UniProtKB/Swiss-Prot annotation:
The keyword Cell membrane applies. Pleiotropic ABC efflux transporter that shows a strong substrate specificity for the azole class of drugs such as lotrimazole (CLT), fluconazole (FLC), itraconazole (ITC), ketoconazole (KTC), posaconazole (POS), tebuconazole (TEBZ), and voriconazole (VRC). Is also able to transport rhodamine 6G (R-6G), a known substrate for many ABC transporters. Required for normal pathogenesis in a Galleria mellonella (greater wax moth) infection model. It comes from Aspergillus fumigatus (strain ATCC MYA-4609 / CBS 101355 / FGSC A1100 / Af293) (Neosartorya fumigata). The gene is abcC. Disruption phenotype: Leads to decreased azole resistance, including itraconazole, posaconazole and voriconazole. This is ABC multidrug transporter C. ATP binds at G889, V890, S891, G892, A893, G894, K895, T896. It holds the Pfam family PDR_CDR. It comes from the Eukaryota. PROSITE patterns: ABC_TRANSPORTER_1, ABC_TRANSPORTER_2.
Length: 1497
């Protein structure tokens, strides 16, 4: 029987049972035991315990008590099985039963005990599966680049040498992460792993759980999983030791219930209780785990993520915990899984783990960065890590004593976990008087002290004893294999780590696939509707094609477009596969299913959509356009279209699965798509393909589909040739017999009114009917080959992993020190190591604040679903220079909202009340004169720390301050914040670059650099940080307040020691009501006396006042209060005193004259810097961002150059024949297709800049939105100019377009014009991208919309359907499309003014009337229509070419060289329109238009 490990009736009686429960739990166990064993032995044992309790502490008695009871429980388990009150909770529970997880009476402990009793009846059916772990000399290393600098466009070129060395196997530096760890965690024990971020906690947990991606164990390392070797555990038993990362990755569209039911089904054992089906088992287990973690109410709520609305962040974290719990692994490693949970829920999590270890025999290791004393006490063992070294491993209750005996002191009210972690920080550890110089200082000294201790010797003896008891490969391994075998499906391989069979895995993933579709059908429906609309548009463009030869080109173009739309309808699968990849990889690590099983399921789940789409799209298109109206022909068309879709889907999936990052996949995908399009056989017929590139046509699956569709359309049909299409025609020629005339279409025969479809295909395309079904077989071959490569790649290629928080520096600015920790470089891990003297010296330069900020009766109302809701309710307070006020409250009390209201950052709703600065209302400069440190550390990832600070200083300090003075001030801020060691380090993205503490310091620094004249707001500055980092941030706040800074700071459940560091407290209850505002007092005496005076219980001496306060007002989980504390405050003398003081401040301060010497001429301006400075600084920053994002620039360059070269050489030296001119037109048409890829590259960059601007820089009035938009549009200009030059050279010359200008001697002029046209195309693309994304949130949405409009512009530009063939309804689109003018100008510039020469297949053959030469016969026709004769003097078989000049071809497609410069001007009109539209849309959609306020502000 499996729960959260194994419900184990045979717990090894020799080992100590882990976990100390509450007294109530122990009492209940004792009562259960007493009922079953009311005998002398138990009585005597009880007496022994009572006697011993006098000698030793209660805590140890509790341990022994639980140990004894559990042993008795084990020995007497058979008695459980005979007791009559045991029931099967999967089948028989009553609604109000304590075993029913859906009942409010549910008790997890009772449920576990009951299940233990049931499983003990048949130990052979439910063999135990436990896995403790012992490790000796555990050392782990990774590999890094010896010189990891920030890459930019220039120095990336230098990386080629590094790449070569890497391929050769050299140039990598070994980085030691963990050194010589020893420890033993027995089954049923809990280990807490303590250490600062970067000390190796994550690496340690990953190592013992076997997740070794990118890290390697040293050869001397030894691991013993209770008789199982580490290699065997990783391969055969993957999923039995799991690692749960602190990130939460789930399918956002699924409900919580479906997510967890999937996990339960994937690990559902075969040896379930009799009569329990897999479905019943999974549903019940899901319900139990949800009840244990308080998730039952979210059963039908979507999980969600940052973009999809779902459960809250804390609930999502608990979903991750529940999913890992349901995997049923006997060894579980949890990495900072309490992050995002408040202390009460964190404690509940630890208690749940304790239940698992106690009853299920699970082994648990947890890394916690902020552990309360209660949470710490739940654990049995603790290990302390210090910069990759282990400085302690032992019992939790002995750890504190170990270090205090060494000479360290634990300050009053500091939790044991904080004390142990503080030892790893030189600035924070406290040495007892008399031990100075005797205690260890460095990590190595701590290690020596630990390894020479008696505690270490005892640990080594325990490990040796454990190894003797559980030798690797011994009996315990066989028991483990037996247990796994009992769980596994009957037809599952013995050595497989998976529980259910492959077919069950596929079935399970398919059910989930359909649930995902149901959960978010909007994307599927929008694609279906979009494709249907596209079919209607194309169908109307080619509406009701005539059944004659005039439709030959149109039919070819239509089938070409149809096969491409079918082929590329799956291109978006690359993006969707990347979105789900982290989830699939995580669940494969949990051994839920093979990645290829999910891949097969996703293919099958997509089939209904693909079939529906194929029918809707192809049916509409086929019958609107009058393609061959025969049942057989339609179904053949549908078949080949569908097979093309499937084949290309497999190709795109292979590309996504075989690349490690999305950017790796996109550029190759773009070039591949281009190649597939060019070599389909329409843009260049096979007879025109150059010999060296002909092979591309053979490996193009679409080409086979296109040939078969063309054969399906033309085979065995004859098409009438219209009179106007005969040569010669009109005038006297019309009276000539047919024998002397011929149809002008390829494949025609002199004297016939009809052209055979087969002849046209054979001569034009070299297509044959005999190839049709052969092609289907080839396409199936491609499909199965790509399916195989996709499934293989999915199974074996994993996503690229984060490099960890290793600092990167700009080349030439600082030599990176050799870090020995992949997680973070410890040399710069803490500002605690900086010179404190320089920090104190720097405070002298910090802006002194003198203004007092006050607010009175502040209310904030918004409408939610049409109903008014009050978020803040008559809040009063003030902040004075040199003080730090804490703003606290329960979750949802409106703490951040109050900060936003006070800082004038709310953009909706109604604000009322009085907010004054020195007794006067706030003006529009208030926002930039205050600093606001947000909870999220948002920074531009390419900038350095110093640059980020300078940007803030230059734009936010008053304009009259000299530039150099601002820059000097930044250096003072760097010193004050202790950031000298990483001032030139690159910020990076979270997880790579600066660590959490350094980011938080930078966020504070950015606000300080602005020299806030009024006050500093801080929103949750310690959220998500470990206790030591929180302490150092509070140190920094102390330093600022001592220098006269006024600070208002929200804080979430601080420790007792952190809480004591604030001067005043503003405490809010639900609904934004004030509970208390005033002094905190020495040891919280003032605060405590207020609450005690009004009916609260006394504050215990060792309690945390912050937690006590929440319990007093009934806001902590499980607490309740009958007192209405907001009402108590409203009627209190303290509130009256606050109001009196506020009135006095207003009266005295408003009368104080403003010092004219301090008056700043621009003091009341909205922005400190003038617009020109704003634009210049923004431009510099965006330029540097582009320069330092070589992936973007090189992707753009690769896309442009490779596309241009590919097209250029595919159409190399194009001839001026009828087909050759058409090919040159398609070479221009194909160049337009890079539009979509360029847009997809531009938009994410813009979104990065915009999110930073809107969240942090706009509210603080750093610079205006006009400067932001202008800078982002201008920055593309130089890069587009460079790209235009590269495209021009790589495309224009290989095709040979310059030769067409030689007859008119205009090579230079036309070359320059062609360059300008390409340049205008790239400028149009970038400005169009900005116009599309300006008002839209997501780059993906903007990209899809831009591509839709681009497709319409391309359809109507006159290439696929000439304007004269368009229905009248669509002529306006032809005129509106910018590509109409661009393609026309480029085509006429490229080919006008030269002679045209037919290919042999294009010549028409006919006889002249008797007694006439060909020249005599054709003279009148040639003079009016053009063309030339190959054999003018012949009297039979005239060989005639219909065009003699390229201008004839141009006029047929409505293009004239005389319009080229005009069209270039029109393109500029479009570009300017795009710019103004982008600015207008941004203003309309995203610029706040002000808010409604009442009262004085």
């Amino acid at each position: 029987m499996s729960l959260l490990g194994t419900i184990n009736p045979n717990i090894n009686p020799e080992r100590t049972v882990a976990g100390r429960g509450t007294q109530e739990e122990e009492g209940e166990i004792a009562r259960v035991e007493h009922n079953h064993h009311n005998n002398a032995a138990s009585v005597s044992t009880d007496e022994t315990v009572l006697e011993r309790s006098k000698e030793i502490g209660d805590e140890d008695v509790a341990v022994e008590e639980v140990t004894r009871l559990a042993r008795q429980l084990t020995r007497q388990s058979t008695r459980f099985s005979t007791s009559g009150n045991v029931e099967n909770p999967f089948l028989e529970t009553k609604e109000d039963s304590t075993l029913n997880p859906l009942s409010p009476n549910f008790k997890a402990k009772n449920w576990m005990k009951n299940l233990l009793a049931l499983s003990s009846r048949d130990p052979e059916r439910y063999p135990k599966r436990v896995a403790g772990v012992a490790f000796k000399n555990l050392s782990v290393h990774g590999y890094g680049s010896p010189t990891d600098y920030q890459k930019d466009v220039f120095n990336s070129v230098l990386e080629v040498g590094t790449l070569v060395r890497r391929i050769m196997g050299t140039g990598k530096q070994k980085i030691q992460i963990l050194r010589d760890f020893d420890g033993l965690v027995k089954s049923g024990e809990m280990l807490v792993v303590l250490g600062r971020p970067g000390s190796g906690c994550s690496t340690f947990l990953k190592t013992i759980s076997g997740e070794m991606n990118g890290i390697y164990m040293d050869e001397k390392s030894y691991l013993n999983y209770q008789g199982i070797s580490s290699k065997q555990m990783r391969k055969q038993f993957r999923g039995e030791a799991i690692y749960t990362a602190e990130t939460d990755v789930h399918f956002p569209q699924l409900t919580v219930g479906d997510t967890l039911k999937f996990a339960a089904l994937a690990r559902a054992p075969r040896n379930r209780l009799p009569g329990v089906s897999r479905e019943q088992y999974a549903v019940h287990m899901r319900d139990v785990v949800m009840a244990m973690l308080g998730l039952t109410h979210t059963m039908n709520t979507r999980v969600g993520n940052d973009f999809v609305r779902g459960v809250s962040g804390g609930e999502r974290k608990r979903v991750s915990i529940a999913e890992a719990t349901l995997s049923g692994s006997p060894l579980q490693c949890w990495d900072n899984s309490t992050r995002g949970l408040d202390s009460a829920n964190a404690l509940e999590f630890c208690k749940t783990l304790n239940l698992m270890t106690k009853y299920a025999g699970a082994t648990v290791a947890v890394a916690i960065y902020q552990a309360s004393q209660s949470a710490y006490d739940v654990f049995d063992k603790v290990t302390v890590l210090y910069e990759g070294r282990q400085i302690y491993f032992g019992r939790t209750d002995e750890a504190k004593e170990f270090f205090t005996n060494m000479g360290f002191e634990c300050p009053e009210r500091q939790t044991t976990a904080d004390f142990l972690t503080s030892l790893t920080s030189p600035a924070e550890r406290v040495v007892k008087p008399g031990f100075e110089g005797k205690v260890p200082q460095t990590p190595d000294e701590f290690v020596r002290a630990w390894k020479s201790s008696e505690a270490y010797a005892k640990l080594m003896r325990e490990i040796e004893e454990y190894d003797r008891e559980f030798p690797i490969g011994g009996e315990s391994l066989n028991q483990f294999i037996e247990s796994r075998r009992a769980m596994q499906a009957k037809n599952q391989r013995v050595k497989s780590p998976y529980t259910i069979s492959v077919w069950q895995q596929i079935e399970l993933c398919m059910i989930r696939g359909f649930q995902r579709l149901k959960g978010d059908s909007s994307l599927t429906m929008s694609q279906l509707i979009g494709n249907f609309i596209m079919a209607l548009v194309i169908g109307s463009v080619f509406y009701n094609l005539p059944d004659d030869t005039s439709s030959f080109y149109a039919r070819g173009a239509l089938l070409f477009f149809a096969v491409l739309l079918n082929a590329f309808s799956s291109a978006l699968e690359i993006l969707t596969l990347y979105a789900q990849r982290p989830i699939v990889e995580k669940q494969a690590r949990y051994a839920m299913y093979h990645p290829f099983a999910e891949a097969i399921a996703s293919m099958l789940c997509d089939m209904p959509y693909k079939i529906t789409n194929a029918i809707i799209f192809n049916l509409t298109l086929y019958f609107m356009t009058n393609l061959r109206r025969e049942p057989g022909a339609f179904f053949v068309f549908l078949l080949f279209s569908f097979v093309t879709t499937l084949t290309m889907s497999m190709l795109f999936r292979t590309m996504a699965a075989s690349s490690r990052t999305l950017s790796q996949a996109l550029v190759p995908a773009a070039i591949l798509i281009l190649g597939l399009v060019i070599y389909t056989g329409f843009t260049i017929p096979t007879r025109n393909m150059l010999g060296w590139s002909r092979w591309m046509n053979y490996i193009d699956p679409i080409a086979y589909g296109f040939e078969s569709l063309m054969v399906n359309e033309f085979h065995n049909r004859q098409f009438l040739c219209p009179d106007s299409a005969f040569v010669p025609s009109s005038g006297a020629y019309d009276s000539q017999p047919l024998a002397y005339r011929v149809c002008s279409t390829v494949g025609s025969v002199s004297g016939s009114r009809y052209v055979q479809g087969d002849d046209y295909l054979n001569q034009s395309f070299q297509y044959y009917k005999s190839h049709q079904w052969r092609n289907l077989g080839i396409m199936f071959g491609f499909m199965f080959f790509f399916m195989f490569t996709y499934l293989t790649a999915t199974e074996y290629i994993s996503e690229s992993k984060s490099k960890g928080e290793v600092l990167l520096f700009r080349r030439g600015h600082a030599q990176p020190t050799g870090s020995h920790d992949v997680e973070k470089s410890p040399e710069v891990s803490s500002a605690a190591k900086t010179d404190e003297a320089s920090s104190k010296e720097a405070t002298g330069a910090i802006q002194r604040q003198e203004a007092i900020f006050q607010w009175k009766d502040v209310c904030y109302d918004i409408k939610i679903k049409g109903e008014p809701r009050r978020i803040l309710d008559h809040v009063d307070g003030w902040v004075k220079p040199g003080t730090c006020t804490a703003l606290m409250g329960v979750s949802g009390a409106g703490k951040t909202t109050l900060l936003d209201v006070l800082a004038t950052r709310v953009t909706m709703g109604v604000v009322s009340g009085e907010m004054l600065v020195d007794g006067r209302p706030r003006d529009q400069s208030f926002q930039r004169k205050t600093g606001y440190v947000q909870q999220q550390d948002l920074h531009l990832h390419t900038t350095t720390v110093r640059e980020a600070l300078r940007f803030s200083a230059l734009l936010r300090q008053p304009a009259h301050v000299p530039r150099q003075e601002k820059i000097d001030y930044v250096e003072e801020v760097i010193k004050l914040l202790g950031m000298e060691s990483y001032a030139d380090a690159v910020v990076g993205v979270p997880g790579e670059g600066l660590n959490v503490e350094q980011r938080k310091r930078l966020t504070i620094g950015v606000e300080l650099a602005a020299k806030p004249q009024l006050l500093l707001f801080l929103d949750e500055p310690t959220s998500g940080l470990d206790s030591q980092t929180s302490w150092s941030i509070l140190d920094l706040i102390d330093t600022l307040t001592k220098h006269g800074q006024a600070i208002l700071c929200t804080i979430h459940q601080p420790s007792a020691m952190l809480f004591q560091r604030f001067d005043r407290l503003l405490f809010l209850a639900k609904g934004g009501k004030t509970v208390y505002f005033g002094e905190i007092g020495e040891k919280s005496s003032t605060l405590a006396s207020y609450f005690e005076r009004n009916g609260a219980p006394k504050l215990p001496p060792d309690a945390n006042p912050a937690e006590w306060m929440l319990e007093v007002i009934g806001a902590a989980p499980g607490s309740h209060s009958d007192i209405d504390w907001p009402a108590v405050w409203r009627d209190s003398p303290e509130r009256r005193a606050v109001h009196e003081h506020l009135d006095e401040l207003k009266r005295t301060l408003s009368q104080k004259p403003i010092d004219p010497s301090k008056a700043d001429p621009g003091s009341y301006d909205e922005f400190a810097a003038p617009f020109t400075i704003q634009l210049w600084e923004c431009l510099l920053r965006v330029f540097s961002q582009y320069w330092r994002t070589p992936v973007y620039i090189y992707s753009k360059t690769a896309l442009c150059v490779l596309t241009a070269l590919y097209i250029g050489f595919s159409f190399f030296n194009a001839q001026n024949s009828a087909q050759g001119l058409q090919n040159q037109m398609f070479s221009i048409f194909m160049l337009m297709t890079i539009f979509g890829n360029l847009v997809q590259q531009i938009m994410p960059n813009f979104c990065t800049q915009r999110s930073l601007y809107e969240v942090r820089e706009r509210p603080s009035k750093t610079y205006s939105w006009k400067a932001f938009m202008a800078a982002n549009i201008i920055v593309e200009l130089p890069w587009n100019t460079l790209m235009a030059f590269l495209i021009f050279v790589c495309w224009y010359y290989p095709i040979g377009l310059y030769r067409n200008a030689e007859p008119t001697d205009s090579v230079h002029e036309r070359g320059a014009l062609m360059f300008l046209l390409i340049w205008s195309f790239l400028l149009f693309t970038s400005t169009f991208a900005h116009m599309m994304i300006a008002g839209i949130e997501l780059a993906e949405t903007g990209g899809n919309l831009a591509n839709l409009l681009f497709s319409l512009c391309l359809i109507f530009c006159g290439v696929l359907a000439p304007p004269q063939s368009l229905p009248g309804f669509w002529i306006f689109m032809y005129r509106v499309s910018p590509f109409t003018y661009l393609v026309s100008a480029m085509l006429s510039t490229g080919v006008s003014g030269t002679n045209a020469v037919c290919e042999p297949v294009e010549f028409l053959h006919f006889d002249p009337p008797s007694n006439m030469t060909c020249k005599d016969y054709m003279a009148d026709y040639i003079s009016t229509r053009g063309g030339y004769l190959e054999n003018p003097s012949a009297t039979s078989d005239c060989t005639f070419c219909t065009i003699s000049s390229t201008d004839t071809f141009l006029s047929a497609v409505s293009s004239h060289y005389s319009d080229a410069w005009r069209n270039f001007g029109i393109m500029w009109a479009y570009i300017i329109f795009n710019i103004f539209a982008a600015v207008f849309i941004y203003w309309l959609a995203r610029v706040p238009k002000g808010k409604r306020t009442k009262g004085s502000t």
